[in-house]
């Protein structure tokens, strides 16, 4: 039986037919899905007085965050967005970049062994063969990742991106701010089976320490909450909430000290960013950037852009990354990125 289209579905179909910018998203543990429609094709860049949906690249020093202006908005419930079981073409993952990625890991290990840094996160993209329905993939992610921020956005001058991220970068009100130090990944079948090794615990500790120090550099007094294991779809992560009174510090300044964290860049942050820029041959673009709703610079709910795909000129790319530390094995690091890619490929294929 054909599922009846919601007003949101109808509005989006009409908007897409005009090739106009739009974004659709749902927050963690929320049944509500929001659609934001922009009525012109212009590229709008966010400032400290903006209201709308913000999308920022990984390297936000070289490009301002993009803003989707809410000229029209629609709401629907996740459960009303239609069938997610419709079969689609199996996603094929290319293995052609293995030697290149292993060579990058070797170079990173040389720098780590020389004590230039402790950890660096290396990312790569995987081009996927075949045609995929982005709206169907978005609905599947909503179904599979109820504890994640799931978003799909499209701009005719930039392309289309889809992500499902468990990692909050920053939530603010006028008086308070909150961030999450998240690291470590486990793919066991239940919470009871999760056993964290020293590597994952140490990596999470680095993230917490970095975010705590960064907030203290602004004169804030962060409160570090207990460490916990959280689930996002088929994966588990170590997470620790950090909160503080905002003390009048503006949104841009808070973001500047929190992004990018060691979880997506490395440790120490400056050395890791320098290595990423020298080693990675492909621009990360919006992968490992951040996105979410902002309201006139006072209130924001932003997430790190992880588990994502992009569409541009009929090319589909999937993005993955992995943290390199002393003792990392290049072959195993390659396999880890392939495993992360397969989790996403199996979901959408």
Give, region by region, the residue ranges found by the protein language model:
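A residue-level signal for conserved active-site and pocket-lining positions in enzyme catalytic cores
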Residues: 54, 115, 170, 209, ...
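Short coil/turn segments at secondary-structure boundaries
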Residues: 118-123, 153-155, 226, 288
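Non-catalytic accessory segments adjacent to catalytic cores
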Residues: 27-136, 192-193, 198-201, 218-223, ...
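Short Pro/Gly-enriched beta-strand edge/turn motifs at strand-loop
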Residues: 7, 149-152, 286-291
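C-terminus-biased signal that marks the final domain/tail of proteins
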Residues: 2-28, 33-38, 42-53, 65, ...
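Contiguous alpha-helical scaffold segments within structured protein domains
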Residues: 74-106, 129, 178-278, 346-349
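Conserved hydrophobic core element of enzyme catalytic domains
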Residues: 245-349
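An anion-binding catalytic pocket shared by soluble metabolic enzymes
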Residues: 11, 16-30, 124-206, 298-321
């Amino acid at each position: 039986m054909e599922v009846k289209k919601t007003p949101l579905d109808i509005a989006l179909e009409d908007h897409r037919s005009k090739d106009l910018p739009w974004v659709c998203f749902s927050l963690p543990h929320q049944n509500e899905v929001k659609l934001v429609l922009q009525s012109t094709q212009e590229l709008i860049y966010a400032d400290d007085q903006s209201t709308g949906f913000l999308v920022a690249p990984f390297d936000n020093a070289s490009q301002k965050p993009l803003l989707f202006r809410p000229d029209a908005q629609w709401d629907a419930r996740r459960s009303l967005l239609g069938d997610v079981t419709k079969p689609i073409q199996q996603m094929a993952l290319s293995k052609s970049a293995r030697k290149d990625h292993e060579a990058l890991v070797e170079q990173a290990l040389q720098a780590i062994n020389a004590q230039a840094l402790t950890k660096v996160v290396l990312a790569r993209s995987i081009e996927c063969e075949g045609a995929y329905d982005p709206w169907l993939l978005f609905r599947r992610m909503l179904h599979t990742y109820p504890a994640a921020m799931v978003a799909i956005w499209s701009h005719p001058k930039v392309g289309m991106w889809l992500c499902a991220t468990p990692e909050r970068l920053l939530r603010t009100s006028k008086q308070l701010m909150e961030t999450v130090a998240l690291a470590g990944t486990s793919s066991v079948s239940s919470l009871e089976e999760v056993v964290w090794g020293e590597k994952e615990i140490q990596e999470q500790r680095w993230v917490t320490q970095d975010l705590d120090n960064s907030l203290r550099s602004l004169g804030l007094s962060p409160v570090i909450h207990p460490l916990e294991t959280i689930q996002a779809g088929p994966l588990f992560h170590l997470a620790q909430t950090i909160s503080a009174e905002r003390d009048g510090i503006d949104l841009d300044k808070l973001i500047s000290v929190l992004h990018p964290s060691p979880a997506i860049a490395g440790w120490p942050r400056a050395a890791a960013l320098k290595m990423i820029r020298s080693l990675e041959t492909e621009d990360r673009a919006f992968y490992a950037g951040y996105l979410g709703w902002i309201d006139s610079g006072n209130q924001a709910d932003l997430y790190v852009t992880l588990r994502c795909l992009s569409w541009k000129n009929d090319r589909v790319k999937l993005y993955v990354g992995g943290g390199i530390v002393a003792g990392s094995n290049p072959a195993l690091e390659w396999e880890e990125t392939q495993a992360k890619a397969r989790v996403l490929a199996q979901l959408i294929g």
